[in-house]
Amino acid sequence: KFSGSVRCNDCELRVSSYGSAQAPVDCRNNCQVTVGSYAKFSNDIKASVLTLKISSGASVSSTLISDALTLSVDSYAKFSGAVTVNSRQAKLTVSSGGSFNGTFSGNSLEAEVGSYGKINLKGSAQVASAAVRVSSGAVFSAPELRVADYDLTVSNYAKADVWCSGTLRINASTAARITYDGPCRVESLTDNIR
């Protein structure tokens, strides 16, 4: 178990094998955090460029603040908290039963949900663009997030729920379920989109 604080220019932090860390991390440049094997991490992480990997039943409860973010959650791991990406793109990847449940604020979002993963984005922040791919059995839910332009790809037996004000481009399989709201213009509307 580690409790304290971490300050660095560049850092790499690993928590694994049922370990736990409750330390705020403040990193000026590149920060890589890996949490795996049923480990737990809780506290704020601030970094210019942040890479966070959560896997194998691990859990992270945190507020993430960065200029650029790459976040992956897989193998029944969980993330909960808040994400703010100030200038560049946020990349979220959730798969193999992993889950992301939190607020998002940023200009640009790229998300991929696969293998029964779930992304639940809360909050009503203004987002210029989002590209989202939802694979079979996965769920992407962001009904309050105010996204201008969406590029949405949804596979069979996957679900997506979004709000869009500009252009909503959809590539959906026949057994996909998509619901949307907002004053958007929909491209490639099919009968499984509501």
Locate each region found by the language model.
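Extended, compositionally simple hydrophobic/Ser/Thr-rich segments
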Residues: 1-194
